[in-house]
């Protein structure tokens, strides 16, 4: 069902949450992290209505819709590249790619019980050089609403010089000469105490937020500003999710580096606001099955948006099984607990080490729906290694252990990947993990 709201609710859209303003939308849109599919990682600019409807139908036929995946998102390259309509100033859908327009595709997607997303950028052009929305926020938001759009991914390309920030924020991606989470090559840092909410980047994204909340349709707002301008200070009051890094690629070094960066941002995760480590690469490139598992498990545990980016009509059963893991999806979509899993021990490194090659290896998170605590153990090394979860080290288990005093107890443990009951496990659980694999457990009631 499509959710609408009147202009009178726009003034009330910012609501106090977690001690800061969060973008709260009608119908609980954006309260939980988004689940869906996007064209970019699979097809880049090679898109059309047929490919998008194929994906939408596969989301239904493969059972992904029943698991909560609902957004079918069109990324860059959907419009006429030469410019806007001269009389209306509206962006024009490419008639060769979309003969029935975007609204025609939206109608078909809605008929499947799914939602549709679109893409633009907070600049003059998109990353692929198509018309973007800076200076046209109101007309574009109105156009998207009229087409039946439910989700906007808003990129950070095509920014003119008069909208460039005064200072440069440190995003410690590999390749930026980052050192332990710092950027020593940054020659234009902001002074101490600088409020990044006053930056031009923040203003560009606020303008589209304000345009979206002024239309009579609820559109989820996904910021894609690549972690710039200290977005963690203002992202939650501006959008429903915000990118924390540069783009992902289907390679383990990049996935590990993003997981490492995002692991330090878990205090920003709760209902209505989600740091976004970028779309999923499950099923793409030359990732091993273990790496696909680790990628998905970490993204789900961090309660990141889970946006599939592979061709669903040719997906393997192994990759589909990863994307369909009911236990991880239940944790991700918990209606009572908004907080994510968090690292409780780094494992390979001393705790709180910033290491793009070796992110935190031990994670845990409370759940209201799993009957226990989610525990992950990652092998970030390049060879098979043994990993051990010690119950007394897991924060969510300490209260139970403390109440038992010196009595030696165990916990009922379930393997998340197989669903197998591993029995009553006392003190600790050990497992041999191949390179870049992850063990995922639900540690349940005491026994």
UniProtKB/Swiss-Prot annotation:
One of its GO terms (cellular component) is extracellular region. Keywords: Disulfide bond, Glycoprotein, Glycosidase, Hydrolase, Secreted, Signal. It is found in: Secreted. This is Probable alpha-galactosidase B. The lineage of its organism: Eukaryota, Fungi, Dikarya, Ascomycota, Pezizomycotina. Belongs to the glycosyl hydrolase 27 family. GO terms for molecular function: alpha-galactosidase activity. The active site is at residues 155, 247. It catalyses: Hydrolysis of terminal, non-reducing alpha-D-galactose residues in alpha-D-galactosides, including galactose oligosaccharides, galactomannans and galactolipids. SUPFAM superfamilies: (Trans)glycosidases, Glycosyl hydrolase domain.
């Amino acid at each position: 069902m499509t959710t609408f709201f009147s202009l009178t609710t726009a003034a009330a859209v910012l609501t106090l949450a977690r001690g800061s303003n969060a973008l709260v939308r009608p119908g609980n849109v954006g309260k939980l992290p988004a689940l869906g599919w996007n064209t970019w990682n699979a097809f880049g600019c090679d898109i059309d209505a047929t490919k998008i409807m194929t994906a939408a139908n596969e989301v239904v036929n493969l059972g992904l819709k029943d698991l909560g995946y609902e957004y079918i998102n069109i990324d860059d390259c959907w419009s006429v590249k030469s410019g806007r309509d001269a009389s209306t100033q509206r962006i024009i859908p490419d008639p060769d790619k979309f003969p029935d327009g975007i609204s025609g595709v939206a109608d078909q997607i809605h008929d499947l019980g799914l939602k549709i997303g679109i893409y633009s950028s907070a600049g003059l052009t998109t990353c692929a050089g198509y018309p973007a929305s800076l200076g046209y926020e109101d007309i574009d938001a109105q156009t998207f609403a009229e087409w039946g759009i439910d989700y906007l991914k808003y990129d950070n390309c095509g920014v003119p010089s008069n909208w460039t920030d005064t200072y440069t924020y440190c995003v410690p991606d590999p390749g930026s000469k980052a050192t332990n989470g710092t950027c020593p090559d940054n020659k234009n840092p902001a002074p101490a105490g600088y409020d990044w909410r006053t930056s031009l980047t923040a203003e560009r994204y606020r303008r589209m937020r304000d345009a979206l909340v002024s239309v009579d349709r609820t559109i989820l707002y996904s910021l894609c500003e690549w972690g710039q301008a200290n977005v963690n200070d203002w992202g939650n009051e501006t959008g429903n999710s915000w990118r924390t890094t540069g783009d992902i690629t289907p390679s383990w070094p990049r996935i590990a580096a993003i997981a490492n960066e995002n692991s330090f941002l878990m205090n920003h995760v709760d209902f209505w606001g989600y740091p976004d480590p970028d779309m999923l690469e499950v099923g793409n490139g030359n990732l091993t099955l273990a790496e696909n598992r680790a990628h998905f498990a970490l993204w789900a545990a961090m309660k990141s948006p889970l946006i599939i980016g592979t061709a669903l009509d040719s997906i393997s059963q192994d990759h589909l099984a990863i994307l369909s893991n009911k236990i991880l999806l239940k944790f991700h979509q918990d209606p009572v607990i908004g907080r994510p899993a968090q690292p409780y021990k780094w494992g390979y490194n001393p705790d709180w080490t910033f290491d793009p090659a070796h992110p935190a290896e031990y994670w845990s998170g409370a759940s209201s729906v799993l009957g226990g605590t989610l525990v992950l153990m990652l092998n970030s090394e390049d060879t098979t290694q043994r990993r051990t979860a010690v119950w007394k080290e897991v924060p969510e288990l300490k209260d139970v252990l403390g109440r038992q005093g010196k009595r030696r107890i165990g916990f009922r443990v379930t393997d998340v990947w197989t669903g197998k009951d591993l029995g009553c496990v006392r003190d600790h659980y050990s497992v041999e993990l191949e390179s870049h694999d992850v063990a995922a457990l639900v540690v349940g009631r005491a026994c």
